[in-house]
Amino acid sequence: MTKRIRAIADNNPMAQLLMTIPGIGYIIAMYIVAEIENISRFPSYRRMGSYAGLIPSLRASGCKERRGKITKQGSSYLRTALIEAAQVIPRMKKSKLSVFFRKRIVRAGYQSAIVATAHKLLQYAYYVLKNQMPYSEEYPVSA
């Protein structure tokens, strides 16, 4: 089965672009391709994050706004695949994503840092697919 998935991923240009992102292999790339279908469905990476359920919930009262846990609305398959891909990032040595993870873990703890890294992976996936260019450490994604 994995040989067939790998063969499909090798012939899919979207999967090839996604596999240039650290932490995303051919299985995760095919999950993303299957769930997203067409990148033009999403006008921004925030909409794509909302689709995956990786955005924080907002609670507002008066003038105060608080961000809570992720909403978990949207595609649970995509969210799970990205969180699995993010599990690899802490083991990387000198990657922009691993630096991002290490900064987050100090502030928020391990699991929250993994979810934030999964969201960052989704942002990179959006830019890679939208621009049709391989991943580069210089992508302008905010923290």
Where do the PLM segments sit?
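A detector of single, family-specific signature residues
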Residues: 1-143
